[in-house]
């Protein structure tokens, strides 16, 4: 029997909708925090298949989500490209900013093969997950990954990357193309290892104007999709251009993704129009899970009422926060699964 999440990606309406959460294996879970301590560094956790499997399975055991998403990080790609990368408490990811000249020296040949521990994690997960649970792989979109490579860290509006793109257009285009090519190989390897579907995270797409969104977000993601589909024509792909606003319109058609992840700022009338084209995923404000109570219940109910009649994967509009109480996550799940169509 086809897994629920895959049925929705294929355009079927399933009610109650399947549910998973971005960052569902994360710091809000005490068992995650314990495993994280054992690993040493965050990257060690990402590159240790047994530990990465454990933290991926933790939210499945606790909550019975309909999908498990591979535990890793979008920045393993630049790390595999030879960029230094470290994660510091309270600061997030840090790396030495790349300059325009260095981009022309980047070599992409065989880079995806350096991420074998990630593929081993996928293989082990497919063996250990319940049959009904969808296994999702993922990568970061080239624009979002490039913003960290250029600034060396996250910034409020990723101004360093935008300025770099304006000043060094040729270097920036090469960087996006290189990242797209390696990311496509990376996703193909995940599908080889047993992933049922993959998601492309473009967390910083919302800081771009319309022209740059087309060049920096849509074209590189379309390049990834085309390369993946050359190997896996039936590959199921979710695109998540967070903060895209009105530019969500046309994203699915232009990139070729099957399902569209929405953030919580998307009006329901617009979301419903996007849903007429195919599956959508989202889009509860993560802070409603932190708040709990009526704020959570009303958020869940509204999504079910406005979007539950079409192909919907229930998710948050971004990753769950470390402050989210576990009991509120369970309350959300119970309310979704007890929902009325």
Swiss-Prot record:
Superkingdom as given in the UniProt entry? Bacteria
Name the top EC class. Answer: lyase
This protein's pathway reads:
Porphyrin-containing compound metabolism; protoporphyrin-IX biosynthesis; coproporphyrinogen-III from 5-aminolevulinate: step 4/4
* Coiled-coil stretches: none
Which locations, inside or outside the cell, does it occupy? Answer: Cytoplasm
Q: Its Gene Ontology molecular function terms?
A: uroporphyrinogen decarboxylase activity
Q: Which UniProt keywords apply?
A: Cytoplasm, Decarboxylase, Lyase, Porphyrin biosynthesis
GO BP: protoporphyrinogen IX biosynthetic process from glutamate
Protein EC: 4.1.1.37
State the Pfam families in the record.
URO-D
Record-annotated site: Transition state stabilizer: 73
Q: Detail which positions bind substrate.
A: 23-27, 73, 148, 203, 318
State the function annotated in the UniProt record.
Answer: Catalyzes the decarboxylation of four acetate groups of uroporphyrinogen-III to yield coproporphyrinogen-III.
Query: Whom does it interact with, and what assembly results?
Result: Homodimer.
Tell me what this protein is called.
Uroporphyrinogen decarboxylase
